[in-house]
Amino acid sequence: MRAMAARCCSASSLATALDVLVLLVVLVFQGSTLDFYLIRSNEGSVAWYFWFLADFLSGEFSRAIQSWVPCPPAFVQAQREEDAPQEDCPHPVWGRFPLCYVSWLLYSLLLVAKVVLLFRLDVAQLLEENARYGVQFLKAVVAAAAVVFLLLVEGHHDAASQSEQRTYLRSLSTGTTFELLDSVTFLGLLFPNETHLTLTYPLENAVLALACVNFVLPGLALFKLSQCEYGLRPRPLGLKLLYKLLHLSLVNVPYLAIRVYLWGFFGHDVSLFIVKNLLGIYAGIRALVPDLRLYCFLLSERGARKRVGDAEARDPIELKVM
């Protein structure tokens, strides 16, 4: 049993090493390319080269996190069956593998800072649509964030291929990947050479802010995964509600509203993601209503138990007679 579990751990270590390699390649490619855009538009200033230092620290942090992930549960369970068994419980607040969502938070904030600078300094707006390193190439570079999220999720679990845990993780990864790609497409509204639109300054800021918020939001999904041990335990209801509410109010609803506004008043081409926003709103509301009712019911039950407990503490003899 120990030998079989050791082989399983060896195969998992090989897969983890491959994930680390691909993750580092993506981080280096994305970070250095965005740095190239910033440095090229600000030639003569040495300060912009310090972005490479930030990319290096982010890459090293991600590599350390991926290398820190222990062997799969099968190997740990085999050792505990032969040795002294003890339950490995996650931290009640930080959850399992807290550095995973911390690394995404640092990475996404660094990405958001670069994206904001690219658009606030008019670097992205001046790119040619058909140039080799133009608009489409910049979109592809920013969209690499979806690959980073996918590798972070895949590198922190060992779910069986046909298990409910694997189904849940695959669904979450796919949904979050589409959300990130939707944000990149939404940023495309800020390229005047491609859209042939001149947005007002408040609308331009709204598009940029909403897109950047959606780059940070997957950190909450990773935090939710850490709390439920990547699908092994029931998912916290409060976090589920918060995640769905934020997606409705900060992603699907405003994205749909702005796209419909530009389509109706300016004749802008309709993005296929407008259908995704409609489906996201419908599915989000349909899933949110029963969860919200359950959450309110649990809150009322907790309040009732607290009132009963207070009454027992005040007059336990009277309650016993009743």
Model regions and ranges:
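Cytosolic, intrinsically disordered low-complexity tails and loops
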Residues: M1, L299-M322
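N-terminal signal-anchor/initial transmembrane insertion module
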Residues: M1-V147, D291, M322
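Membrane-interfacial loop-to-transmembrane-helix junctions in polytopic alpha-helical membrane proteins
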Residues: R7-L14, E43, D88-G95, L99, ...
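Intrinsically disordered, low-complexity regulatory regions of eukaryotic regulatory proteins
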Residues: A17, T177-L180, P202, V308-P316
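Alpha-helical transmembrane segments of multi-pass membrane proteins
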Residues: D19-Q30, A54-G59, S103-K114, K139-A143, ...
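Intrinsically disordered, low-complexity regions of eukaryotic proteins
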Residues: L21, Y37, L279, E312, ...
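Multipass alpha-helical transmembrane domains of eukaryotic endomembrane proteins
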Residues: L150, E154-F266, I285-L299
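Small-residue-rich transmembrane alpha-helices that serve as helix-helix interface/gating elements
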Residues: S271-A283
